[in-house]
Amino acid sequence: MHDYYSDDNIILKLTFEFSLLIIEYTEKLESQTKYILARQLFGSGTSIGANANEAQNAESKADFIHKMKIAAKKGEETFYWLSLCKQSPNYPDCDFLIEKLIIINRIIGKIIFSSKK
């Protein structure tokens, strides 16, 4: 079990904090009856951290890279849903989520790249 607020593993910390923000944001969407997008965003946005966490117990280096690649894919999917929210009228502001996600996606990309060496 991991301490998600520890600075020992920055990607776990950032993705856990991001998941909490996604929960809060999707609750706002649901309160505005924007259920379909809320569910899509909730699933992909929280999956980034879940996959990064699962990678910590990978059976091999290849398994670790594979799980981190899934986290990267979920990051890209989340970026898509947030971009839709940003461009759609009457949706709550999500710029802060996009900014945090860009950082997370870059870190995951660097982790994957450095793990391949």
Residue ranges and their predicted role:
Residues 1-54, 58-117:
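Short, C-terminally biased terminal segments at protein or domain edges
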